[in-house]
Amino acid sequence: MRVSVLRRFGNLPTTPLYTGLIKTMLRRFPSILTMLCLLLSFLPAASVHAATPTPAIDPLTSAQKMLAKMTPEERVGQLFLVTFTGSTADQNSQVYSLIHDYHVGGVVLQTANDNFVSSPDTISSAYQLISQLQNIEYQASQSQPASSGTAAPNGTGTPASTETVEVLPTAVPANYIPLFVGISQPGDGSPDDQIFNGLTPLPDLMALGATWDPALSEKVGAVAGQELSGLGFNLYFGPSLDVLETPESTLGNGLGASAFGGDPYWVGAMGSAYITGLHTGSNDHLTVIASHFPGRGSADRPAGGEPATVRKSLESLKQIELAPYFSVTGDATTPAGTADGLLVSHIRYQGFQGNIRSITPPVSFDSQALSQILALPAFASWRTAGGMMVSDDLGSPTVRRFYDPAGTSFLARLVARDAFLAGNDLLFMGNIISSDSNDNYATVVNTLGFFNQKYHDDKAFAQRVDESVLRILTAKYRTYGDFNIQTAVPSVDGLDSLGQSTAVTFEVARQSATLVSPNMADLDTLLPSAPVFRDQIVFLTDTRTERQCSTCNESPMLAVDALQNVILRLYGSQVGGQVSSGHLVSYTFTSLKAILAGGPGDPSLEGTLRQANWVVINMLDAEPGEDQTKTLHSFLSERQDLLRDKNIVVFAFNAPYFLDPTDISKLTAYYCLYSKSAPFVEVAARLLFKELSPQGDLPVSVQGVGYDLFTATRPDPGQVIGLSQQLPEAPVSTISATPEATATPKVGDTFSVRTSTILDHNGHPVPDGTVVHFTVSLKGADGVVQQMYAVTSQGVAAISFSIPRAGLLEVAAESDPALTSVILQLNVSGGGFSVTIVAPTTVPEFTPTATFMSTPLVTPSAPLAQGYPGLGGWFGMVLLLVVLGGVVYWLGSRFMSVRWAVRWMLCTVAGGLLAYTYLAVRLPGASDYLKLGGFSGMIGVVLLGAALGLGAALLWQRLVTGSTKRSG
């Protein structure tokens, strides 16, 4: 074997010396290899990763390169999101032409346009349609060599020619850019979702808000992101970041349970978590467009009619409406929690637009107002980083009513132009139909032609187009990294995993279920037990229908017997026999009309209700104008004879604020489930039979039960705020033979204190920004009281201060109305230090917890009583002035005369006394100064007064001396 190895070294000398050397190396090769491996193991870890793959190209750089290659028509097309009718996109379809010939940037799929088919083919058909749409764009880009944009003098690629351009379909695009394929799927099925079957039935946003758990919100977002991106969607409209500060069903903002809640901080926290889930669940293949910017939670009317108005000041808008949008843009804590774009709503805002008139445009068409909003720091930094603005549906009735109130002339191209120049980058055309066009397709084509013409004629307009297209391309590169059909169209194998995450929805249903009325203590009295076998139960259900498409069969949003069937499945004769199927009967709200005033009567229904022990009412939303809602109100007010001596339980499968106080007073129990999918119906059944307890808390104010969210989210006055030393974050660990010792605080060091998590009335962390007042006291002969303020972050506030001298230091905290905290005592002495936690006297069960060494000290009386000079402060002032007076007298007698020495001393002491008197009698400004400066501040004021007195004496001497010289 060794000979064969040696023969491989054909050019080596064959002398015995070389032969022996090679034999020796071969013999010792295992030892040499072992030594090399051992040496390599000591190399730094960084060297192992030195040959990592080349990092991905920056999306902005890729977008700039693509923009330079695009024709004007391709650029203009990227601005438009279009809709179309039907569930296919063959070569004869209008959407095929819009993609192939006019290069539109994206499409939006909607149930109203029959883009989806009925179950069981809903998912497979949607996947095929999206794949078909992306392939139209891809095949068109491959049919010709790549084009290069005609460079303009400004270098943007804008053609220099300004000649009139004939509007015709252009040659197929030579640059492949994946389409945006968008959808709005906020949860809870119809009417807001677009896909009703085949996907996991996700909850409404308010159900997430009622859990007060951002982690659950992120999980739901991840499910939505994974399933929608698996179908091929890459543009998501949502989540809604509207703040329902004072929800009023009488006005109706149209949001129902499609908002997280009414607290700006929590809406932002839940929204940020949801966006994080969308990004991570889709592997960053979803471009997330948060809605409905700048917020329509306080709108005076629902969308769909004339433009709504939000009458709030600018400051109020920044604190309430805009706060959640700050948290997902410039103030976002993570890239995953940052929205890629904002959907600009067609609403007017007094805080940005001044007095609102009928001619005041919605903010989506008001360049001055929108620019003012986007100039706010959080939005400005986000826009600089590539954030997109997307117009809401330009074909909505709201837009048409504003532009054409008389119904005579509606020019879509001008609407699109105004929205674009107002600051929107991406224009959602919707089903817009211009008065000079036959249909939506012709309207979009004419609008594209109008934009192309302006691009050629107007350099400023062309530059504005290029800016928006660069944002759009950057967003698409962030989504895909590289433009190829393999990444734009997901694998069909992923469809098998869709709709398998119902466990997440059930967990949300379990944690969000809320007892609205009465409270838990009263519930056990009013409803001590669950239904039993002999009880008769009548279910009254608000049944409405939905269609996946115009030719699809109708199906109920909430089946009339949905709750009855779940109860039989869980508690019927097959599983313990807690109830009898013969004792359960279900009716619709419509059936109640027969037994109301003016109805024909229904003896059978009346008889069933009279015999019932339980009446369980399942209601959906109750916006004004809903006939079902009127029926329920009439039933509760007119037929109390049928409800007397019965257990009346209401389950609200939407928002909780639709019943008034009078209606609620007639109920035994009122629960809110927020969503109507199967997991929520099951939780309702388990609540009725007391198998589960409601764990959720109302995320909005409910006037019907006197629940005010602002009060509920303030600190709970019954809690004791904990305090602890806040240690600096440990540095990144490195291999070390001996750990470093913990630093010991000493005089002059900075000491940090943090609170425990401060809880609100519902037991959740208080919103960020809650003010906490700290009192820092240094005990001693010249003790100090210092007032410090901090705001919470995730329920915790912290302060840092310098240790002025050795002694006993105490720290307390309060956050109105929570006024009690433990006392943190820091004892610093020459021999060491100790930190002791002392429980407040009002909470005897707490015991002091000491760390390190603890030496009890006698605490002298404070020199400042409640922030003002006390006896200790007076003695300190007198001592100081005696010393100062003595020094001044000695200097005067040595350098001047005894007479002037006495005058200097008296003026110095008088100045100090006057300054002390100013503080002691609490003249204007004294209180605030002492609270900030404490005892040292008082000494400073006395010294200043003494200095002014001495200065007056010197001036007096100079005047007298000068007068004597002149007389002489």
Task: Report each predicted region and the residues it spans.
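Preference for extracellular/luminal or secreted protein segments
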Residues: 51-103, 196, 384, 403-772, ...
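N-terminal hydrophobic targeting/anchoring segments and the immediately downstream early-domain regions
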Residues: 51-197, 201, 518, 612, ...
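Second-shell residues forming the walls of enzyme active-site clefts
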Residues: 71, 91, 119-128, 132, ...
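Short acidic, glycine-rich surface-loop motifs adjacent to enzyme active sites
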Residues: 98-123, 328-363, 610-625, 917-924
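Active-site-adjacent structural elements in enzyme catalytic domains
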Residues: 117-189, 209-232, 236, 265, ...
